Amino acid sequence: LFEDLLQRHLEARGYQVERVMNLTDVDDKTIRGSRESGRRLADFTAVYKDAFFQDLDTLRIKRAQHFPAATEPRYIERMIAMIQQLESQGIAYQAEDKSVYFRLSKFPDYGKLAHLNLEELRPTGRIANDEYEKESIGDFALWKAWDEKDGDVAWDSPWGRGRPGWHIECSAMATA
């Protein structure tokens, strides 16, 4: 709703707006749902994508002009290139589990806008049960190593088969 209101406001002020909205089509939840339903990932997420568009139309919310999907080959390639660049700068690292993580310790001001103190972070249930190995509690996955629970949802990369993490998806699509 916010994006719709902002777009309408800017257009009323004479600005030309080109809006892009990522519809997450690969993450832990979609893979799990796909597996549990016995459907291919693309078929599973298509149902939710269609319902989302119907909701937009029902509420008369303006659609974005572009809806990129993280699973498009050009974005997967972009994500891999971005992770390689971060890795070469020491900002990303591959852990023992073969996943690649973003090293938050390289950014002392991370969380400043949200008034977060990284030293005071404690694991939540989700983080405590995280299946991935990382240097610090705040580090997040850029590339998740393939796991048999992922089924056929994986791409080849310099770190082995795996899939993108949520954060890098948006970064790659926003800068493509």
Question: What residue spans do the PLM features occupy?
Answer:
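NTP-dependent nucleotidyl-transfer catalytic core
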Residues: 1-176
